[in-house]
Regions:
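Bacterial N-terminal signal peptides that target proteins for export
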Residues: 1-7
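Short N-terminal alpha-helical targeting/association segments
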Residues: 11-13, 56
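N-terminal signal peptide c-region/cleavage motif recognized by signal peptidases
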Residues: 15-17
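Subset of outer-membrane beta-barrel
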Residues: 21-414
Length: 414
């Protein structure tokens, strides 16, 4: 792919990303900032969303800022990731199905020096997308009317990663991100269906932004012919500059009330994780644990409030590589399988909202070049039908277009 083609793809992708926010249909996204989206490449998604202890030379590992330290010094890397999903949601009373898709991230990177690598990109940070109906009764008359709750939007991040190789087996990395986004929540009371009255719309638009940073490290060591890599990441508690505009109007577009809030702060929790990778010959295995201290975050500024719990996620995966990049087509394919298990941060009726999923992945090379297409599939279960809550079963696909071009080779002329 030529430099002009890469530049065009970057411009097109950033144009798409401005509209790509609804990466979920979960009713649990109505609380706080929505469903958290890990910053990762499609290859890591196929390994159960595990990337803290990975440092590949074939693709950009953005799960750990130190994970780009092993990039090829002659190559330029560029990735565009897309996502599509189908979600079936079921409670004890009814069920619904939703499908959607959008862009899931853009990244590019290169190795500037023997000891220094860079990556920049765009990725979703949180996603909001839900539509819920409820039936209520008018006090006194006993007439019933329908209420609709819906929301959309989320936060995005534009990031810059740098990885430093301090010694042969030890690297550190830093991530600097700008977070921004809009979350819209709408509540509609359909009084016209009960007594012919006016439908009342209550619309709230939240806007949030600030900087965000994360650090990471990786350390390689060998035991005989077995290769190991330890990885760790840490992101401190941050806060977002947040404000909202609220408008109440009826079904004839007549504004009844409006309110502009005083800016307030919403905290993003402290997050940290550790991972370990084992590799011997053609097989790689990785396992990791991530924790986020959501219990210290107060959610009293949003319309729909909930208690938050600390989250934990344990995940791992196995990759099989038949051959090296200079081998025939079939030998350059990569096969992955993974599993993830964790707890959502929303606490409703003292129920643990467990999230677990099985992942599969494959990388298919394009011709004789270093470019490839990476695909990851996940079947995930989130939530429970206990206490009148919703259980979600989600099938999602991610596809990544991985461009790796030799840009920095010096040619000799006679």
């Amino acid at each position: 792919m030529s430099a002009k083609a890469v530049a065009a793809a970057v411009a097109l992708s950033f144009g798409i990303s401005a509209e790509a926010q609804n990466s979920t249909s979960s009713p649990y996204s109505m609380y706080g900032l929505g469903i958290y989206s890990p910053k990762e490449d499609v290859a890591a998604a196929g390994l159960g969303h595990s990337g803290i202890a990975l440092a590949p030379s074939e693709w950009l590992n953005i799960s750990n800022p130190a994970g780009i330290s092993k990039l090829d010094s002659l190559s330029f890397y560029f990735n565009v990731n897309l996502k599509g999903f189908y979600s079936h949601e079921e409670s004890g009373y009814e069920s619904a199905s939703v499908y959607s898709g959008n862009i899931d991230g853009i990244s590019l990177g290169f190795r500037g020096r023997k000891w220094l690598s860079f990556a920049i990109g765009y990725a979703p940070f949180t996603s909001v997308g839900y539509k819920i109906y409820q039936e209520k009764t008018i006090t006194g008359s006993g007439e019933k009317y329908k209420v609709e709750y819906s929301g959309s939007g989320g936060l995005s991040q534009a990031y810059f990663d740098a990885a430093f190789t301090l010694f042969k087996h030890w690297s550190i990395g830093g991530n600097f991100s700008v977070l921004w986004g809009t979350i819209e929540r709408l509540e509609v009371n359909y009084f016209s269906s009960a007594n012919g009255g006016e439908d009342i719309y209550n619309k709230t638009k939240y806007q949030a932004n600030n900087i965000y940073w994360e650090v990471g490290t990786q350390f390689d060591f060998n035991i005989g012919k077995n290769n190991f890599r330890f990885g760790a990441t840490y992101a401190p508690e941050m806060w977002l500059h947040t404000s909202y505009d609220q408008t109440i109007y009826n079904n004839v577009s007549r504004e009844l009330e409006s309110d502009d809030s005083t800016p307030f702060r919403f905290h993003v929790p402290r997050m940290y994780g550790v991972g370990l990778t084992y590799q011997r010959n053609k097989v790689l295995g990785t396992i990791e644990c991530k924790i986020a201290e959501w219990s210290k975050v107060e959610d009293n500024k949003f319309r729909y409030t909930a208690n938050f719990r600390d989250t934990y996620t344990v995940s791992g995966g196995i990759q099989y590589s038949p051959g090296s990049p200079d081998k025939p087509f079939y030998a350059r394919m990569r096969y992955r399988i993974g599993y993830t298990y964790g707890r959502n941060y929303v606490d409703l009726y003292n129920c643990n909202l467990i999230e677990k999923g099985l992942t599969l992945g494959i990388t298919v090379p394009i011709g004789r070049s270093l470019n490839a297409i990476t695909i990851a599939y996940e079947h995930q279960k989130r939530g429970t039908q206990s206490a009148g809550l919703v259980e979600e079963r989600i099938s999602s696909f991610k596809i990544g277009f991985n461009v790796r071009e030799i840009w920095f080779m010096k040619h000799k002329f006679e």
